[in-house]
Every structure is written in C-alpha cells, then in structure tokens.
C-alpha cells in the first residue's frame, strides 16, 4: 500500500529538517510526502524543497486542520498519515503502519508519544517535560500528532 504523508507547517524551520530526514530515511519506500505551508514566514518551504515532496503554499494562515485537509485533496496514497512537523518517526514506523493496514479489520492507527527528548538544551528539555506531562495526563498516553486513517 502507498502511504500519503501529510505535514502541515507553520514557521517550522527549527524542526522540519529532522522530521523530513526521519521520513526519507525510513526502511519503507512506497510513500509520498505533501508539505503544506500555512503561510509560513520563515524558511520552512526552502527546507522542504530539499526533499522529493509536493509543496503547497497557502496564501493565509488558516491553521493545521485546514492545511491537513488541503493535503488530503492532493493525496494519492491508500493510507493517509498526518504528521506534525516536529515529530520524528522511527525508521520502521511506516513499515509497521503498512503491515497493520494490510489487516482489513484495521481502520485507524494512532501513534504513541516517546519520552526521549529530541533537543538537549535545558530550556527545551524543561518545555518538553512540562508539555509531555500535561499532554499525556490529559490524553491517557495517546499522542495525536501522528495519526493515520485508512481512506
């Protein structure tokens, strides 16, 4: 199955490269990436241009939900994967997604947040810890940034 990876970005220049590197270094190769710039004013689009992906640029900021929906309109895959620009997937994540959707009883899959901090400076670690604690306690350990829906 082909996976359409939809990544909305808004001034994501600090995290987008790492997100895209993780996707393109995946051991699963049957995918397309659609990056939707939600009227970013930083160099997010220039970063995305370094990868083999489709880039949509919205004329005004309308939020990540609108951007995701625009990405869905361009998707050609059998599986939709909504990935936030600050999410770094594991090398085998796309393979696991594909394998799970081969079971026709599966309609949706949701990712789980990892506690391993991506960035090592003290301020960022504090912010990640604080955010993680509240997101996890409110969502009962579910992480919504990486969510897939079978078309």
PLM region spans:
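Short, flexible, basic/aromatic active-site loop/helix in glycosyltransferases
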Residues: 111-115, 123-144, 149
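Catalytic metal- and UDP-sugar-binding loop of GT-A-like glycosyltransferases, i.e.
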Residues: 58, 83-85
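A conserved acidic beta->alpha catalytic loop
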Residues: 14, 22, 37-45, 87
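Short aromatic/hydrophobic "clamp" motif used to bind/position activated sugar donors
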Residues: 80
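Conserved donor NDP-sugar-binding/catalytic core segment of glycosyltransferases
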Residues: 88, 92-123
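Acidic metal-phosphate-binding loop of nucleotide-sugar-dependent transferases
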Residues: 62, 87-88
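Short, acidic, metal-binding catalytic loop of nucleotide-sugar glycosyltransferases
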Residues: 21-30
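Glycine-rich, basic loop-to-helix element that forms the pyrophosphate-binding segment
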Residues: 58-75
């Amino acid at each position: 199955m082909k996976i359409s990876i939809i990544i909305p970005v808004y001034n994501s220049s600090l995290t987008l490269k790492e997100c895209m590197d993780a996707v393109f270094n995946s051991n699963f190769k049957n995918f397309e990436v659609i990056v939707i710039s939600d009227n970013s004013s930083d160099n997010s689009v220039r970063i995305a241009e370094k990868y083999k992906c489709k880039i949509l640029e919205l004329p005004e900021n309308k939020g990540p939900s609108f951007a995701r929906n625009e990405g869905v309109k361009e998707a050609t895959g059998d599986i939709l994967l909504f990935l936030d620009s600050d999410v770094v997937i594991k090398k085998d994540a796309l393979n696991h997604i594909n394998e799970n959707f081969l079971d026709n009883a599966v309609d949706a899959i949701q990712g789980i947040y990892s506690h391993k901090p991506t960035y090592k400076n003290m301020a960022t670690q504090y912010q990640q810890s604080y955010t993680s604690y509240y997101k996890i306690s409110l969502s009962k350990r579910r992480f919504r940034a990486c969510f897939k829906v079978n078309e």
